[in-house]
């Protein structure tokens, strides 16, 4: 399971000209799910993201976490995070989980994230053609892969 997390001042997700999530001051999380991903990956990645100290304290040092600053979040499914570009010019998505596997894991990730954070978060529409708007803060952008925890 791979996540690209971006610290943002604001973000929103729109599907079919309807806004389905809006937030201020927190994280926009792009989530890619692989064939082998499971609930252990969900647990580890949720804890890692929520507790990662990437928000500034009063001295402008990154010592605060999403949880400690009571920040918001939007989680967006993005299978293209598992693109392979080794051969040719057309990316291969063979490592990305099929929708019937990925969607339940995506929904479990959102549920676990909300439970760990202690508040509701926004999300995109799984498989939807989404328009994601954001205003980076920093910028701070970090890639986290649950396969690298071992």
Swiss-Prot record:
Enzyme Commission no: 3.1.1.96
Protein's recorded name: D-aminoacyl-tRNA deacylase
What biological-process GO terms show up in the record? D-amino acid catabolic process
Q: Does the keyword Transmembrane apply?
A: no
Give me the reactions it catalyses. glycyl-tRNA(Ala) + H2O = tRNA(Ala) + glycine + H(+); a D-aminoacyl-tRNA + H2O = a tRNA + a D-alpha-amino acid + H(+)
Question: Top EC class per UniProt?
Answer: hydrolase
Please give the Gene Ontology molecular function terms for this protein. Answer: D-tyrosyl-tRNA(Tyr) deacylase activity; Gly-tRNA(Ala) deacylase activity; Ser(Gly)-tRNA(Ala) hydrolase activity; tRNA binding
Alphabetical list of PANTHER family matching this protein: D-AMINOACYL-TRNA DEACYLASE 1 (PTHR10472:SF5), D-TYROSYL-TRNA TYR DEACYLASE (PTHR10472)
The record's subcellular locations are: Cytoplasm
Subunit (UniProt): Homodimer.
Which range is the signal sequence, renumbered to this chain? Answer: none
- Gene3D superfamilies assigned: D-tyrosyl-tRNA(Tyr) deacylase (3.50.80.10)
Record Pfam families: Tyr_Deacylase
As annotated in the record, motif Gly-cisPro motif, important for rejection of L-amino acids runs over 138-139
About its domains, the entry says: A Gly-cisPro motif from one monomer fits into the active site of the other monomer to allow specific chiral rejection of L-amino acids.
Task: State the family it belongs to.
Answer: Belongs to the DTD family.
SUPFAM superfamilies attached to this UniProt entry: DTD-like (SSF69500)
Known function: An aminoacyl-tRNA editing enzyme that deacylates mischarged D-aminoacyl-tRNAs. Also deacylates mischarged glycyl-tRNA(Ala), protecting cells against glycine mischarging by AlaRS. Acts via tRNA-based rather than protein-based catalysis; rejects L-amino acids rather than detecting D-amino acids in the active site. By recycling D-aminoacyl-tRNA to D-amino acids and free tRNA molecules, this enzyme counteracts the toxicity associated with the formation of D-aminoacyl-tRNA entities in vivo and helps enforce protein L-homochirality.
HAMAP family from the UniProt entry: Deacylase_Dtd
Entry GO terms, CC: cytoplasm
Keywords, sorted A to Z? Cytoplasm, Hydrolase, RNA-binding, tRNA-binding
